[in-house]
Amino acid sequence: MCILALQFQVARDAPVLLAYNREEDAERPSSPPRIQSGRPRVVCGVDRKANGTWLGVNQHGLCVAVSNRPKRAVPPEPISRGLLCRKLLGAANARDAARMAVDELSSGNYAGANYVCVDASYAAVVYGGDSIR
């Protein structure tokens, strides 16, 4: 289980304070955070099994994090939740990323997940379990 703590617009000089602990299979290979190729520029670690990420920030100040959640109806071959996290990091802001998350999760192609999309002016949690909200 992953643990995420977020303070949004609490500290005057830091509108987003985020702490995240990834609790994943210790044998699952991953790369440490680094600047990824492409635009916008993104800093994130990479899950080398599925090429996704669990947490990242882009050059616009958008931060996206994913955590697993239960879902009764999981597709037989779900798309990697970490790949969706990387896709959301392509957005210009948190509002757009949250809309993209709702659209993607509504496809039914993912196992259960929560997505936190936050920047200096907007924060959202998209719950992608048996219903999307």
Which positions does each model-derived feature cover?
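N-terminal nucleophile
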Residues: 1-133
